[in-house]
Amino acid sequence: MKISIIGAGSIGGAIARGLAKGTLFKASDITCTSLSEAALQDLKKGYPDIHITQDNLEAARSADMIIIAVKPWHVEGIIDEIKPVLQLDRQII
């Protein structure tokens, strides 16, 4: 299962690290996005197999599950941005 985490800040980064450390998912099946290149590079240092990008649409396109981990006032904009690639069989959290 491919998982994309949109927003790799404090919460999204913690979710990504927890999933990558666990046994249910491989780090190589996780993609994280952030506006902050520094946050992405920090995540990549600890988990080199995690995919990183600043392109939310790219991340959502390849995901079976999308976790939106941004501040509440950004959620509507993120949904509007990724809407073109959303499908009924994809889970959004």
Question: For each predicted feature, which ranges?
Answer:
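NAD(P)+-binding Rossmann beta1-loop-alpha1 motif at the extreme N-terminus of oxidoreductases
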Residues: 1-54, 58-62
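Rossmann-fold NAD(P) dinucleotide-binding segment
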Residues: 51-93
